[in-house]
Amino acid sequence: MDHAELTTEQVLKRDIPWESYMANKLISGTCLQLLRRYDHKPESQRGPLLDEDGPSYVRVFLNILRNISKEDTVEYVLALIDEMLAVNPKRAALFYDNSLSGEDIYDPFLRLLLKGNWFVQEKSCKILTQIISARPKMQNGIVPNGEASNSKSKLTSTQDVLRGLVDWLCSQLRNPTHPNCSVPTAMHCLATLLREQYVRALFVQADGVKLLIPLISPASTQQSIQLLYETCLCIWLLSFYDAAVDYLSTTRVMPRLVEVVKGSTKEKVVRVVIMSIRNLLAKGAFAAQMIDLGLPHIVQNLKAQAWTDEDLLDALNQLEIGLKDNLKKLSSFEKYKQQVLLGHLDWSPMHKDPSFWRENINNFEENDFQILRVLMTIIDTSADTTALAVACYDLSQFLQYHPSGRIVVADLKAKDRVMKLMNHENAEVRKNALLCVQRLFLGAKYASFLQT
């Protein structure tokens, strides 16, 4: 059978020759007794056994993984442990019982993670993630399993395991072993591991942050929605770590997050994206970009929807306040750009301020004269008379202050589009459309000369 398509249910139907292993002294008589009580029993019987003597079963499983290399048996024991933890994740604490303080509880899984087939790798990864995340925290200098907190071997072992785990997860994101399962498995484990600051540092060092960005895109199927959610959860966890934020500021993470939040109706996805954006805004590197992407307007639209999650509602309120505060701090040109991109033009002082136009005229060349193109869209489509009048006036100001203004505006085929507004019913619109056309025609001969 193809191990890449093997399921837990198929593996757990196997009959493992435990008696043969005992005869060959690979397991003890006590192990055999425990396995007979546990093997192929329903959870209603296994649960009480684990409640009564869970650490003994953990020791049996670890010994088998350490001493027996037969693939069918290794897969079977990993499936048993995975099922045990899936039924009750708190059972991961059994690995830290005092009676197991001398056991190397991580090594069997780390070894299999690097050597096994896909089924073995996936189970080892999930199990290792669960048990290392459940390790006891130090209290009064003593780790609850009885080892002193200054035990260098224990600390190094934990660090080595986390490093090995993070490296393996990054390798799966770069070059998946399984075409369909590697990436979801890696993201599921990272969404747990990145809760630790030390793991965040390891992930950044392993150049893992850039591997998340392509995974942030609108999703439709249940599986892809879960992958998107866990990816965005990882971004949220990384937003608490400055080195990760510094790296994120060099990527296209913000446009992708905004695209997701615009297109998603799944509340948990919207919540984790908004909470990520809120944290990134607080770090200060993304404010202008958020405003350029129209996030203030998006937040207003989201607030108008009937969300039930209190964390999401709080995050939306905080984000709205934060964006308003940052908008006040932005330069006059950034404020102007925000007005244009949102189509919210009014007669704020900068429009008629000669120094604004002199100081910022070259900024209008950004993104292939994006602002001029948006002004033309407003002229073509807006029903707001103030926006139309201001757009015509701003276009005339560009003609006046930019050395190649008339050529640029002519290339946009603006003349006929503005001339239509010279017959507009609103006097303010007519006046500013006329001003714009006059400035365009006054230099027509000069513009023609420059183009030859």
UniProtKB/Swiss-Prot annotation:
The role this protein plays is: Subunit of the peripheral V1 complex of vacuolar ATPase. Subunit H activates the ATPase activity of the enzyme and couples ATPase activity to proton flow. Vacuolar ATPase is responsible for acidifying a variety of intracellular compartments in eukaryotic cells, thus providing most of the energy required for transport processes in the vacuolar system.
Protein name, entry field: Probable V-type proton ATPase subunit H
Task: State the Gene3D superfamilies in the record.
Answer: Leucine-rich Repeat Variant, V-type ATPase, subunit H, C-terminal domain
* Keyword match Transport: yes
A Pfam family that this protein carries is V-ATPase_H_N
The similarity comment for this entry is: Belongs to the V-ATPase H subunit family.
Carries keyword Transport?
yes
Organism annotation: Oryza sativa subsp. japonica
Key words of the record: Hydrogen ion transport, Ion transport, Transport
What Gene Ontology molecular function terms does this protein carry?
Answer: proton-transporting ATPase activity, rotational mechanism
A GO term from the CC aspect: vacuolar proton-transporting V-type ATPase, V1 domain
